[in-house]
A protein has these predicted regions:
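Acidic, glycine-rich A-domain
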Residues: 1-221
C-alpha cells in the first residue's frame, strides 16, 4: 500500500484531516501478479539417446520453447542432463533456456547424446536452481523427457528407481507437478515405478505437440 495519495481508495485513518484542508487522504494498492505457470523441460542427454532419438528430442524441445517463448503466462526453463562424463559419480546439468538467459537463443541446437543419466539428481538440481530464479507462487510443472530408465555408475536398477522416485516426491513437496514423457526405449514398468504421472509417446517426432498439449491442459488454454 502507498499512502498519502490524491486519488485511490479512501484511507479511513486520515479522515480526521479533512477539516484541516488536507487532500492526500487516499491510498493506492500495488499488486504484483505472478505468472500462472513455471515450466521446466528436463531433457535426458544420455548416450542411449543416440543420434536419431536425440535429434527427435532436440527438435521437440526447440518446438516447445518456440511455442512458449512469447507466452506472457509462462516462465520457461530448459535443462539437459547427463552423468559420469569424464568424472565418475558426477551429474552434469546444461542450461539451454531460462528467463534470465536471453543471450543464446540458439543454444538448444547443441543438445546431444552424452554419457549416463542420474535422473533423481537432475530433478532436484532443477528444482533448486529455479527456486533461486523464480519468486512465483503459482503452479510449477516439470516435464521429464527420457528414452529409458536412470542409469549411471553405482546408480542402476532398483537403487536408481528408488532414488529417482524419492527425488520426484521431494520436488512435489516444493510445489512441482512432475510428468514423465517417455519415448523410444522407455517402458511402462520403469515409468510407473518412478512417476505417478507419465505418458508414452510412440512417435518421437510428435514430442513437441504432445508436451504442448500437456502444458495447455495444465494452464487451461
Amino acid at each position: 500500500n502507498i499512502y498519502n495519495q490524491k486519488r485511490g481508495m479512501i484511507n479511513k485513518r486520515q479522515l480526521h484531516k479533512i477539516p484541516m484542508g488536507m487532500t492526500d487522504l487516499f491510498k493506492a494498492t500495488i499488486v504484483k501478479e505472478d505468472k500462472p505457470l513455471d515450466v521446466c523441460l528436463l531433457v535426458d542427454e544420455s548416450g542411449s539417446m543416440g543420434h536419431y532419438t536425440m535429434r527427435q528430442a532436440r527438435e521437440g524441445a526447440i518446438a516447445i520453447k518456440e511455442a512458449l517463448h512469447d507466452n506472457a503466462m509462462i516462465n520457461l526453463w530448459v535443462y539437459g542432463h547427463s552423468a559420469d562424463d569424464g568424472v565418475r559419480g558426477t551429474t552434469e546439468m546444461i542450461e539451454y533456456s531460462s528467463p534470465s538467459m536471453q543471450d543464446r537463443p540458439m543454444a538448444m541446437g547443441g543438445m546431444k547424446a552424452r554419457c549416463e543419466n542420474r535422473d533423481g539428481n537432475a530433478i532436484v538440481a532443477s528444482v533448486q536452481r529455479i527456486k533461486q530464479e523464480s519468486d512465483n507462487n503459482a503452479h510449477k510443472l516439470m516435464i521429464v523427457l527420457s528414452d529409458g530408465a536412470p542409469s549411471a555408475d553405482c546408480y542402476r536398477g532398483e537403487v536408481a528407481y528408488d532414488h529417482t522416485k524419492k527425488c520426484v516426491k521431494y520436488a512435489e513437496t516444493q510445489g512441482w507437478s512432475i510428468i514423465q514423457v517417455g519415448f523410444s526405449g522407455a517402458t511402462k514398468y520403469t515409468m510407473e515405478r518412478i512417476f505417478d504421472n507419465w505418458i508414452y509417446v510412440d512417435d518421437a517426432s510428435t514430442l513437441g505437440d504432445s508436451v504442448s498439449k500437456i502444458i495447455r491442459k495444465v494452464i487451461k488454454i
